[in-house]
């Protein structure tokens, strides 16, 4: 009784606290077990995920967990996901340039025409010790799949041309005269060599308006998320081959295992299969 007075609590309140201790212990144990599942989903394939990505991965593990609960347990156990930062690096190296700027035919209608109709392309950089390497990517705006990519130590135009050639080697049967290749107005895409190559392959060209990143927003989004998820590996890269191997692994992961809310919780490759066949992954059926 004296202890209750010193603590400023009633005797009945003290006994209620004692009686509830078992329930608190049970809740703590349950939280920890659920957190272990969250951590397993977070660590899957070695790339960090936010609460949405964790919920979608848990579903593939046969576990349904409320997103608010996932967020609560992430805060409780200090599990943080990376936050994307704006990309300050917008200027690319010199390349042959023409005054031929294609109109913005796509007009942000990224997902209005189905798969293999609007293909987005852009270049970003990745840090390697005291220098940069450069990644050129082609992304299907409808399925979000990465269809072709090339990594280069140089900003010379060759690797951008090779990205288009890789697209045609691997997806030739899907390409036709209705395909748009949409980019910004960077010097690579206005070059004679690039425009001639598109013409040779009978691919149509569309360009964002100058200084308007929203005109190529899905591609910008991909680069932003990719850089966040690759951040833990940047300081482990010693040479160009290290970066290449990680990019190869990441693109495979992204296409096959990075589930997206926009795609109904499917990965890009799963979504393309669903669009073509009408069949969802078994984990999402029922």
Write out the residue ranges for each language-model feature.
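Active-site beta-loop-alpha junctions of metal-dependent nucleic acid enzymes
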Residues: 131, 150-174
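Basic, flexible linker segments flanking DNA-binding modules
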Residues: 4, 13-114, 212, 269-277
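Acidic/histidine-rich, metal-coordinating catalytic segments
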Residues: 174-189, 209, 266-269
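C-terminal domain-tail junction helix/linker
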Residues: 192, 199-203, 225-286
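Mobile genetic element proteins and their domesticated derivatives, centered on retroelements
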Residues: 3-4, 14, 38, 54, ...
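K/E-rich alpha-helical interaction surfaces of small helical-bundle regulatory domains
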Residues: 1-22, 44-47, 246-264
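An active-site-proximal beta-strand-loop segment
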Residues: 108-147, 153-155
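RNase H-like polynucleotidyl transferase catalytic core
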Residues: 83-87, 180-185, 199-218, 234-239
């Amino acid at each position: 009784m004296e202890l209750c007075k010193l603590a400023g609590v009633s005797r009945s309140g003290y006994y209620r606290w004692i009686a509830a201790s078992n329930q608190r212990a049970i809740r703590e144990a349950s939280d920890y077990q659920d957190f272990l599942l969250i951590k397993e989903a977070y660590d899957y394939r070695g790339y960090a995920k936010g609460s949405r990505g964790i919920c979608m991965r848990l579903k593939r593990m046969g576990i349904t967990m409320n997103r608010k609960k996932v967020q609560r347990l992430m805060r409780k156990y200090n599990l943080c996901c990376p936050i994307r930062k704006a990309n300050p690096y917008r200027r690319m190296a010199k390349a042959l340039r023409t005054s031929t700027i294609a109109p913005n035919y796509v007009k942000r209608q990224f997902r209005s025409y189905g798969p293999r109709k609007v293909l987005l392309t852009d270049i970003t950089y990745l840090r390697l010790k005291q220098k940069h390497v450069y990644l050129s990517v082609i992304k299907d705006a409808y399925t979000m799949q990465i269809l072709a990519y090339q990594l280069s130590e140089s900003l010379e135009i060759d690797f951008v041309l090779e990205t288009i050639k890789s697209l045609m080697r691997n997806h030739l049967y899907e390409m036709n005269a209705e395909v748009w290749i949409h980019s910004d107005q960077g010097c690579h895409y206005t070059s004679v060599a690039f425009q001639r190559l598109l013409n040779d392959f009978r691919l149509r060209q569309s360009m964002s308006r100058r200084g308007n990143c929203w005109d190529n927003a899905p591609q910008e989004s991909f680069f932003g998320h990719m850089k966040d998820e690759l951040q833990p590996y940047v300081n482990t890269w010693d040479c160009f081959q290290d970066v290449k191997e990680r990019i190869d692994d990441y693109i495979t992961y992204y296409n096959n295992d990075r589930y997206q809310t926009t795609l109904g919780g499917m990965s890009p490759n799963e979504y393309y299969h669903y669009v073509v066949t009408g069949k969802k992954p078994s984990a999402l059926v029922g």
